[in-house]
Amino acid sequence: MKIITLPDELNIESLQPIQIFDYCSTKEIAKQQIILNQNTFSFLIDGNKEVVFNNSTLSIDNSKFLIMKSGHCLMTEKLSVIRNYRSVLLFFSNETLLKFIRENELNRNKLSEFKSVYSFKYDEFIHRFVASLLDISKLSKSIQKRMLEVKFEEVILYLIEIYGTDFLFSLSEKSNALSQKFIQTVETNWMNKLTLKELAFLCNMSVSTFKREFEKNYAESPIKWFQNKRLEYAHHLLYKEQKSSSEIYFEVGYENLSSFIQAYKSKYGITPKQHHKD
């Protein structure tokens, strides 16, 4: 699968610190490897969107919009009932973000966690804001540049007023140290049914480097570790939540019931059904 770099590969004449792109598609994509070279608002209009980052995963319909940190992610786009996908994208550089924080003298809060993607619900203000972006996109490039600087400040100030500054400082946070980022990626995504290639992409590593780093941190192979984690979670669902094997096998990463039962018996010595009897 080809890696897509945004906004570089969009039909934009020249890259700017703040820029807009009205993205429309009639094709679905699943776990497309994306490199975001700028932070990005995705104002979803039609369809559904899911993004997976190293430290967070979000799915939205067109009642919400996303703001995403620059970096690596896996993106899924699903068409609406009218077989359409549309998202108004507003890109902005890290320099633009840091300049805004400095000029507005915002105080950095101590965050318990840093996330690479946030979702917010649409309201009347945001609906009007998106409509104004579409109007601006029809103007000359020189006017667009000046007006988008104002519009960027407008939407960030509004979101801070409603939601506080946590999202802003998460976006401005520098990347974690390599080992910390690696562990965070694994621990956040072990239930997301990602391939080793997809996990390695989120860590900006080759698959072979990912495997070496994994064994260094976890002292066993990725396949064995992920299988054990999922079986332990299955054990929790069977015991604590009293669910049946047929209800959970797909959720914990197995394509069919028989392979789940076989793996469970291999780990615990008895079948899930025998566990229920006990």
Regions found by a protein language model. Name each.
Residues 184, 188, 193-198, 205, ...:
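Terminal helix-turn-helix DNA-binding modules in bacterial transcription factors
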